[in-house]
Swiss-Prot record:
The keyword Zinc does not apply. Expressed by the venom gland. GO terms for molecular function: toxin activity. It is found in: Secreted. The lineage of its organism: Eukaryota, Metazoa, Ecdysozoa, Arthropoda, Chelicerata. Keywords: Antimicrobial, Cytolysis, Secreted, Toxin. The keyword Secreted applies. May have cytolytic and antimicrobial activity. GO terms for cellular component: extracellular region. GO terms for biological process: killing of cells of another organism. This is Oxyopinin-3c.
C-alpha cells in the first residue's frame, strides 16, 4: 500500500543523505 511505498522512499532518501554526508567528511 501507500505506507509501504513511502517507507521505501524514505529509506532511499536516508541512504542518499548518509552517503552524501560521508562524502562531505
Amino acid at each position: 500500500g501507500m505506507k509501504d511505498y513511502f517507507k521505501k522512499l524514505l529509506q532511499k532518501v536516508i541512504k542518499k543523505i548518509k552517503s552524501f554526508r560521508k562524502k562531505q567528511d
